[in-house]
Regions:
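Membrane-embedded helix-loop-helix hairpins and adjacent transmembrane boundary segments
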Residues: 1-290
Length: 290
């Protein structure tokens, strides 16, 4: 491991990596406005991550929100810097894996090349742990939403705790099975699936979260309209090729986010049945901030 790290350091100090990276970036200067907008639009997805938001909802005290926010932001910055470093250096250190399908294994390939099996296994376990942490959080959020909000909230309001638990377990099984089937598609990549899911989360939930936090005029009907409109736009935009029109090359999260936001606002303004209890709760939280 030390020999690999030493060799890696020598190549970095010699300027080899810098020259190689410069050559790769200069060879890809044909980026237009569409790829740039699409890259920036990825940030919209953070507003609609239910498995992250639920952590803040379950916080012990509202006094800890500010600290938690800072910790989360710092951690994301550190993680993304590490990701960029590994990906950038991997394109030079491991040029043989630059095919679109193999490029997703750059982290594991770099570890296998630089560290012995024992240490490499520990690092690879960290990747698996991160994936499992995200997966189980999303499964729990999805199953609880279906069992509590849909089954008990709409289908059977007098459902017992045992019935809700059974529905929750069934939902976990079905969602996991669907995810497994999607993973069997040999023509799809991890990045492609994550990108699609990221757009779905961000465009359907993101605008609603922002409206719920900053606008007391938002209503349930507006939220439902925005949710449906954003979701349909994501699916439709994703399946329309850019050859139809250049604008369809824009990452689907951006148009879907706008559609969801506009529909939620318009329908809420048209909805005369405002919930006085929700407005009072909004005002109470606003006074707490002041």
């Amino acid at each position: 491991a030390m020999a690999s790290v030493a060799a890696f350091s020598e190549r970095a100090i010699s300027g080899e990596f810098g020259e190689a990276m410069q050559g790769k970036f200069l060879a890809n200067q044909n980026y237009g406005i569409v790829p740039i907008i699409s890259a920036l639009a990825w940030g919209l997805g953070y507003f609609g991550m239910p498995h992250i938001l639920i952590r803040f909802m379950g916080i012990r005290s509202n006094k800890e929100v500010a600290l938690s926010r800072r910790i989360a932001t710092v951690w994301v910055v550190i993680a993304f810097i590490g990701t960029l470093i590994v990906g950038s250096l991997g394109t030079v250190y491991l040029p043989e894996i630059l095919s679109p399908s193999a490029a997703e294994t750059v982290f594991s390939a770099t570890i296998q090349k630089m560290f012995p099996a024992f240490i490499g296994g520990i690092f690879l376990c960290a990747i698996l742990a991160a994936a499992m942490s995200t997966a189980d959080s999303q499964l729990l959020v999805a199953s609880s939403a279906f069992s509590q909000d849909i089954f008990k909230g709409l289908i059977k309001k007098d459902a017992t705790t045992k019935e809700v638990l059974s529905i929750s377990r069934i939902a976990v099984f079905i969602i996991a099975a669907v995810a497994f089937v999607l993973s069997l598609d040999e023509n799809s990549s991890i990045f492609g699936l994550v990108s699609y899911a990221w757009a779905g989360f961000g465009a359907t939930f993101g605008p609603l979260v922002l409206l719920a936090l900053f606008w007391k005029g938002a209503t349930a009907k507006g939220a439902i309209a925005g949710l449906i409109g954003g979701g349909v736009t994501v699916v439709a935009w994703h399946n329309i090729p850019a050859t139809v029109a250049p604008i369809f090359g824009v990452y689907e999260i951006l148009p879907a986010f706008i559609v969801c936001l506009v529909l939620a606002v318009v329908v809420s303004l048209l909805d005369k049945n405002k919930d006085p209890e929700m407005i009072a709760e909004f005002e109470a939280f606003k006074k707490m901030e002041d």
